[in-house]
Curated annotation (Swiss-Prot):
Keyword Membrane: no
Active-site residue numbers: S98 (phosphoserine intermediate)
Coiled coil: none
Domain of life: Bacteria
Gene Ontology MF: a single term: phosphomannomutase activity
InterPro entries registered for this protein in UniProt: A-D-PHexomutase_a/b/a-I (IPR005844), A-D-PHexomutase_a/b/a-I/II/III (IPR016055), A-D-PHexomutase_a/b/a-II (IPR005845), A-D-PHexomutase_a/b/a-III (IPR005846), A-D-PHexomutase_C (IPR005843), A-D-PHexomutase_C_sf (IPR036900), A-D-PHexomutase_CS (IPR016066), Alpha-D-phosphohexomutase_SF (IPR005841)
Entry keywords, A to Z: Capsule biogenesis/degradation, Isomerase, Lipopolysaccharide biosynthesis, Magnesium, Metal-binding, Phosphoprotein
Lineage: Bacteria, Pseudomonadati, Pseudomonadota, Gammaproteobacteria, Enterobacterales
Gene name of the encoded protein: manB
Recorded family membership: Belongs to the phosphohexose mutase family.
Organism name: Salmonella typhimurium (strain LT2 / SGSC1412 / ATCC 700720)
Protein name, per record: Phosphomannomutase
Reaction(s) the record says it catalyses: alpha-D-mannose 1-phosphate = D-mannose 6-phosphate
Length: 456
């Protein structure tokens, strides 16, 4: 019985060598096969140097468990989601460590319908079997097959189904794939739009997949990773910049001046894009920052619905509400017609179309929203006793709060400002978000007060 520390709350991630290696990948494949008893599973991998070897070890484990394997090659996580629901197979696994350091790799697991396998939905069971390693002998006669396939054309068809290509007017777009898996998909979309006669110019930087990440690990959430995209937008006079993380399940947008747009305001923008096409639809959002999304959705005739943060919660709530779209301020965007999964390609297509339809720049589309509901951005504080600190904050504001909500951590609302404070699931950190109604000095002052209370 070996303890496998690479099994995390939502996925598998570990340092290469002792935490994750080909033997462990083989065990995970066997365990997935024994637990789910799938007939066919799709596999893909990101650009990391170890992804191919880990994927093939995983395939061998699955085949030894009697599972047929379809390998879609180098791909983003969402291409595995797409392959799983499009082919109607029993599951999928993407080998990826997204934006983790160079010496890491990992896996994201789904079952039929691209439903996530995380902590309480099977991941612990797979872990238990992989740790025990007590597998039945391989039955050579019943061993699974292995086949390489390509679904990229069908995937591009699906992506372009979210917009009407005829709505696209002349646009110049900068793409930064960060040498991750997004590059070949961007090339394929460019070729398809060109063939359809769409007047969109693609300017591509760091587009070649390269597992050595010569330009750094792609994680545009970090300000130091945004400079190349910003400069390219300004240099080329582009209408918009789009940057991706390594497995492109998130995309990050920059306006025509190279300004990074916080994910919070993109949620409102995508909600608006969907409500133009689907009046009265329900939109799911997370509790960290809410006022802008609620205002935009309500004004557009939709219904905003708040869900606990995290992909498993958002997807589940979308299913129960039959919501067309769900967005988190962390740049994760979920789509009903994409099997409720998140995609980093659908958002920029919708925003590009919206820019054309509204005849306004991206900066113009979000400027009023940012002024109406200025936000602090997420501030992390490492505390010895997070629960006591949160209780201290609640006691301090208890009398003046107009509303208190515990959907996720502690949210308190006042006449012209609100905050959300939540403990991290994975580390001794509390995460603070503050927003106000059009009053930046108030938002900043309240943020200072909250941080002082937390750190007492």
């Amino acid at each position: 019985m070996t303890k496998l520390t690479c099994f995390k709350a939502y996925d598998i991630r570990g340092r290469l060598g002792e935490e994750l290696n080909e033997d462990i990948a083989w065990r995970i494949g066997r365990a997935y096969g024994e637990y789910l008893k799938p007939k066919t599973v799709v596999l893909g991998g990101d650009v990391r140097l170890t992804s191919e070897a880990l994927k093939l070890a995983l395939a061998k484990g699955l085949q030894d468990a009697g599972v047929d394997v379809l390998d879609i090659g180098m791909s983003g996580t969402e291409e595995i989601y797409f392959a799983t629901f499009h082919l109607g197979v029993d599951g999928g696994i993407e080998v990826t460590a997204s934006h983790n350091p160079m010496d890491y790799n990992g896996m994201k697991l789904v079952r039929e319908g691209a439903r996530p396998i995380s902590g309480d939905t099977g991941l612990r069971d797979v872990q238990r079997l992989a740790e025990a390693g007590d597998f039945p002998p391989v039955n050579e006669a019943a061993r699974g097959s292995y086949r390489q396939i390509s679904l990229r054309d069908a995937y591009i068809d699906h992506l372009l189904g979210y917009i009407s290509v005829n709505n696209l007017t002349p646009l110049k777009l900068v793409f930064n794939a960060g040498n991750g898996a997004a590059g070949p998909v961007i090339d394929a979309i460019e070729a398809r739009l060109k063939a359809l006669g769409a007047p969109v110019e693609f300017i591509k930087i760091h587009n070649t997949p390269d597992g050595t990440f010569p330009n750094g690990i792609p994680n545009p959430l970090l300000p130091e990773c945004r400079d190349d995209t910003r400069k390219a937008v300004i240099e080329h006079g582009a209408d918009m910049g789009i940057a991706f993380d390594g497995d492109f399940d998130r995309c990050f947008l920059f306006d025509e001046k190279g300004q990074f747009i916080e994910g919070y305001y993109i949620v409102g923008l995508l909600a608006e894009a969907f409500l133009e096409k689907h009046p009265g639809a329900k939109i799911i959002h997370d509790p960290r920052l809410t006022w802008n999304t609620e205002a935009v959705v309500t004004a557009a005739g939709g219904t905003p619905v708040m869900s606990k943060t995290g992909h498993a919660f958002i997807k589940e709530r979308m299913r129960t509400e039959d919501a067309i779209y769900g967005g988190e301020m962390s740049a994760h965007h979920y789509f009903r017609d994409f099997a409720y999964c998140d995609s980093g390609m659908i958002p920029w297509l919708l925003v590009a179309e919206l820019v054309c339809l509204k005849r306004q720049s991206l900066g113009e589309l979000v400027r009023d929203r940012m002024a109406a509901f200025p936000a602090s951005g997420e501030i992390n504080s490492r505390l010895a006793e997070p629960a006591a600190a949160i209780a201290r904050v609640e006691a301090h504001f208890a009398e003046e709060a107009q509303a208190v909500d515990r959907t996720d951590g502690l949210s308190m609302s006042f006449a012209d400002w609100r905050f959300n404070l939540r403990s991290s699931n994975t580390e001794p950190v509390v995460r603070l978000n503050v927003e106000s109604r059009g009053d930046i000095p108030l938002m900043e002052a309240r943020t200072r007060t909250l941080l002082a209370l937390l750190n007492q």
